A protein has these predicted regions:
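…primarily DNA-binding HTH/wHTH and HhH modules…
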Residues: 280-306
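A conserved beta-strand-loop-helix scaffold within acyl/acetyltransferase catalytic domains
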Residues: 178, 191-238
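Short amphipathic alpha-helix that is part of the acyltransferase structural core
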Residues: 1-27, 140-194, 304-306
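Conserved hydrophobic beta-strand within the GNAT/NAT acetyltransferase core sheet
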Residues: 230, 263-267
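Conserved acetyl-CoA-binding loop-helix of GNAT-fold acetyltransferases
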Residues: 82-91, 241-257, 276, 280
């Protein structure tokens, strides 16, 4: 694997990965932001060029200084040759197995291959599979048409649905970094200093969205990550069941479409209310699903998990 640095090569790779949506969404979304300023300081590895078979995005080495920060230490993968993936992942030049880290992807059939490498490294692997949701507009990015983004914008705008919540005097707007603690305190996978730092970084660099109450406080929100995935969606308990999330997401999707930003999300298997909500917004579940592996070296296995 070697680094792909030239902007025009990254643009070619990005266009090529669009043809493999939804399986390529994690790396596709990462590269989308890399070629637009790279605020998270990520880098792209391929096994060959231009006929690549494997793509990995990861933080630059100087970003991965905290061995116990899996929010930062995250790798996104896409492979056309799953059988060759173990050989790639076992290389210390590709993956730092001495850290706690995440691997994320949107392809079936990689669990056994990743776990086989993990066994050889004597690390603990925690695997999660969830439903991957995209809109019809994202699926149309698979087109090789040069006006791909314009088509995405037109289709997405047509598919936007209107919702009105049951609460008056609310205002849809972008999240501010001052809202980070509120988001962190209500994120199932957050509630710690490392996640707070990560959330602040996301809100500072990518458009998050919320509904404000009459006093200007967020009551429903969502955050965009470096892969263009929308995560951390939440509505305060006293406002749940009143259409808040629907209205916020409708405004958020409209904003992203106006900015020509692709987006997707995932939902946990048992969260039936969220499944219904995203379907009403025009999202469709993808057969490939959303996958995450958390790797923990032996020296950290007795410590509290995040």
């Amino acid at each position: 694997m070697f680094l792909l640095r030239e902007v025009h090569m990254l643009q070619i790779l990005h266009q090529s990965l669009a043809k493999s949506i939804p399986e390529s969404l994690k790396v596709y979304g990462s590269i989308f932001h890399i070629i637009r300023g790279n605020p998270f300081k990520l880098e792209v590895l391929v096994d060959s060029w231009p006929d690549y078979q494997n793509v990995i995005t990861r933080p630059q080495k100087e970003e991965m200084t905290d061995d116990m920060d899996p929010y930062t230490n995250t790798y996104h993968i896409f492979t056309k040759t799953p059988d060759k993936l173990p050989e790639i992942l076992e290389s210390s030049k590709v993956i730092n197995w001495d850290q706690i880290f995440h691997i994320q992807g949107c392809q079936q059939g990689l669990d056994e291959k990743i776990k086989s490498v993990a066994a050889s490294k004597s690390v603990q692997i925690d695997y999660s599979k969830r439903f991957l949701y995209t809109t019809e507009a994202i699926q149309q990015l698979k087109s090789s048409n040069k006006k791909m983004i314009e088509k995405f914008h037109e289709t997405a705008t047509q598919n936007t649905r209107k919702f009105k919540s049951e609460v008056d005097n609310r205002k849809p707007t972008l999240l501010d970094v001052s809202h980070s603690e509120l988001v962190n305190d209500n994120w199932k996978f957050g509630k710690n200093e490392k996640s707070l730092r990560y959330i602040k970084r996301c809100i500072q660099n990518f458009p998050g969205y919320c509904l404000l109450d009459s006093k200007g406080n967020p009551i429903s929100w969502n955050v965009m990550e470096a892969t263009c995935e929308l995560r951390m969606a939440y509505t305060l308990p006293e406002y749940q069941g009143k259409g808040m999330l629907q209205e916020m997401m409708n405004a958020y999707m409209k904003y992203l479409q106006e900015k020509n930003l692709p987006y997707f999300l995932h939902v946990e298997d048992m969260n039936e209310n969220s499944h219904k909500a995203v379907r009403r917004l025009g999202f469709h579940a993808m057969p490939c699903d959303w996958h995450e592996w958390k790797s923990t070296p032996k020296r950290f296995q007795q410590l509290p998990h995040f």
